[in-house]
């Protein structure tokens, strides 16, 4: 009996010794709550460097006083917060003071986190300590000039501006409004970007109830982005949709907000999103706020300046393929500019920033595919100013003009880098207005952009010339027109004879357009030829023109039709339709062309040949895929391009009655459809 009693005593002692260890282990439910609190606070966005380990810090944060680097908040005991007690963590979060007694810069939104409840703070601490992987990564020192590198001064800043009180619900407001106020003012720290700052970098108000509450969320410029006023935002449903998906019927997020949506708000519960939106809607508009639209923009007639101003022509060349001539954008893909608050904002910082450096959509569960707008820094300051001034004054936008000096100032601050080393010189459609025959060449350009609309009797399907000759024939490797007229008359193997430029154009009408030829001497044909001649410049018949045609792919690559179908579904269907029918808007206007069916090109078209189509696809499709100027075009591998081209070129399409007359002297390509 002695030994069992001894064993029992030993077990009891071991249990007692182990109790402190288990007492420090948070229950899974608390860690899960803490993970959600971390999402509410968007901790990962600031505490994760680009391509860095989550929560390990190192992200560069620019301030008017210098550069700060976010800290490592993983539970690593040497370089992170692994040795913090809860009390030390709580003090840091509420007062901005580290365990060593050092004040942190208020770029960390501890004045907002001070409003957190103790329950949320304890849950967050449990998650960071037990739900995040420890990473050994030393913190980087801030690069601050005098006197801002004297951290003792931050204690005075705290004395003047810090309110350490936790959020107290307003008894006069319901539970939804109070929850929204708690999230916006506290964990969400929305005011860090959206509230104007004072001379000491303090937020002018920490809530709408402050003495200066009219400033709360009234808009601020942060790191060259304009954080718009959030007061009296759209309807609750519209705001919920934006926070959940990154876009709604009025706007699409950009800049740092895309990361906020991706890492943070898309993960909020619908109840919390509704609470946030309800609170924002309850705030009266600021004195300088533009009125928030209540009705989404409907397609409208293009502005009269579209084709008779430099800004309008620049817009048509570089912007309209995604944002459309009416500024309506493409739903779910590219944002509308008509009625877009960032476009017409009194402070155009975001618009300038996006134009110079580019933009990406937020990656969300609703919109998992990221679309990219390349930067347009290669355009001159005056060109950008003209285009943006046109955008800000069109489609009922009421923004003030942009000057070249404003563009230059932003360019100098951002120092955007262009990496495209192509020798191709992109023609500028704005220069059409300086031509002696300006009216004729502008008409010729429009016939390429609006072929179906302007020549309905000659176009037998839904295509326009620009469907294949991108941006009206001005994109390298997008079948551009630069120098082309210098090579006509020229021998055409398919015709077996020398053809004129007019005959070549009519070949497109009969094949790609599945339509009827234009009379060679007609006004419209001569306008099209004049447009080609305008792009001829000094090209001679013996010259090689950089970027001409669509390039080539190796015809030894064997297509895999099964993979082609998969590539089409993943990369192409969103613009060209699940069944190749193209993409149309609600009013029936074609946005992107059909790739097969009765409204597509016939079997006599060059694009009906698999390897020709593959070369085009490789260099030009999809658009919005990455940062390549000017459409973010191309990006598939050679094999993927061949596979998907073989897949869609073999789909049903109209016949070409004169196909038997092609290649009369032999040499028919192996991928001809007949």
List the predicted regions and their residue ranges.
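Primarily the internal scaffold of c-type cytochrome electron-transfer domains
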Residues: 62-68, 143-165, 170-171, 181, ...
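Axial heme c-ligation environment in periplasmic c-type cytochrome domains
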Residues: 61, 67-83, 88, 94-119, ...
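Post-cleavage N-terminal segment of exported redox proteins
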Residues: 1-30, 68-71, 92-100, 119-174, ...
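Sequence context of c-type cytochrome heme-c attachment sites
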Residues: 32-33, 40, 48, 53-80, ...
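Short, solvent-exposed loop/turn and secondary-structure capping segments
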Residues: 48-49, 54-59, 102-104, 135-142, ...
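Boundary of Sec targeting at the N-terminus
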Residues: 24-25, 35, 371
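Conserved hydrophobic/aromatic "anchor" residues
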Residues: 38, 84, 89, 127, ...
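Sequence/structural segment immediately N-terminal to covalent heme-attachment motifs in c-type
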Residues: 28-49, 53-62, 156-159, 168-198, ...
